[in-house]
Amino acid sequence: MRTVRGPSDRVVVVGAGLAGLSAALHLAGRGRDVTVVERESWPGGRAGRLDVGGYRLDTGPTVLTMPDIIDDTFAAVGETCSGRLDLLTVDPAYRAQFADGSSLDVHSDADQMATAIKEFADAKQAAGYRKLRDWLTRLYQTEFDGFIAKNFDSPLSLVNPQLARLAAIGGFRKWDAMVNRHISDPRLQRVFTFQSLYAGVAPRQALAVYAVIAY
């Protein structure tokens, strides 16, 4: 994102999707006069809903992976997320169904997930899951601090100490290869790699940096 030079007291944000609304709140919190324009008659962008034949259908994102960012957005204008929204944890997050007829409930809690994997496969796979989770945590922390939470005015901005750390922990290796180091059960490997499809990339082709989606 290039830094804007010169006066920026009045800002127009195009689109009232989640990104547009977030940008507007952060700008307003910094004293800017903000106008948001949206082509639809409702805000939310892709995070919408259709009512069809008595059913409610999501039109876009169905998973909230980084609630802390919502907290930061509300805090920018002196509000709190909890004062406006009730975020309820879904447990299990989802159920994975496999071609052999087996199924696995996927939990966000590490202990619950390890127990589920032990019952689904064996203790070795459960231990591998914990090691995988530790690696994903380090990967996320490295990416968030060095890249996700930063603005970049030029490609040279990408060159920083975090880039070397990212390479050292395997961020530029293949996603499926890194997962396979910890887990050998093909079904479990799919559980922790299919998320690359969200980015339109097959797990065998995706770089491990994308694995933060699974985290």
Where in the sequence are the language-model features?
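A short, compositionally biased domain-edge/stem linker segment
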Residues: 1-3
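Rossmann-like flavin
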Residues: 99-207
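Residues forming anionic-ligand binding surfaces in small-molecule and nucleic-acid pockets
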Residues: 205-215
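N-terminal glycine-rich phosphate/pyrophosphate-binding loop and immediately adjacent elements
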Residues: 5-142
